[in-house]
Regions:
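Small/polar-rich, solvent-exposed N-terminal microdomains that initiate assembly or binding
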Residues: 1-54, 72, 76-77
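Residue-level marker of positions within ordered structural domains that often coincide
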Residues: 14, 45, 69, 86, ...
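A generic structural micro-feature
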Residues: 32-34, 54-58, 102-106
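Short, low-complexity, polar/charged sequence segments that are solvent-exposed and flexible
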Residues: 42-45, 57-61, 83-87, 112-113
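Glycine-rich loops and low-complexity Gly/Arg-rich segments
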Residues: 48-50, 63-67, 88-91, 118
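Oligomerization/assembly interface segments of phage tail-like spikes and tubes
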Residues: 56-69, 106-116
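Conserved short hydrophobic patches within well-ordered secondary structure
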Residues: 66, 74, 80-81
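Acidic-leaning, charged glycine-interspersed low-complexity segments
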Residues: 79-118
Length: 118
């Protein structure tokens, strides 16, 4: 089962106002995507191991990237993403922070740990 990234991010009205429907899976946005936008992808997923029986939970590592033409806006949106995920009890850390010369967009990427009971 895929993590509930879209649902969690859309629960924050400020994120919703900033990006609208522009939250894209697989880490890829359309070339004509409105800016700013958010992409996300599953880095890895594994069951939580235990000594006996089937796993009781799944651990998914997801990267969520915020993209914008404005550096300050990227930081503001990344803070909103971080705060929204942390409010759901998810661990968040910065994975990448930079500028993409090909797209002329700033990018701030967050790694988020989704641990879900089965």
């Amino acid at each position: 089962v895929l993590p509930l990234v879209y649902k969690i991010l859309r629960s924050n009205t400020e994120i919703k106002q900033a990006v609208g429907e522009a939250i894209y899976r697989h880490g890829i946005a359309p070339l004509d995507a409105p800016r700013p936008y958010i992409t996300w992808f599953l880095v890895s997923g594994r069951p939580e191991q235990q000594l006996s029986g089937t796993p009781c939970a799944d651990f998914d590592l997801v990267q969520i990237d915020v993209w914008s033409e404005d550096d300050a806006e990227v930081e503001r949106l990344a803070r909103l993403v971080r705060d929204t995920c942390e409010a759901e009890g998810l661990a968040v850390r910065i994975a990448v922070n930079g500028y993409e010369p090909e797209t002329k967009l700033f990018r701030l990427g967050l790694e988020v740990d989704f641990i879900r009971s089965r």
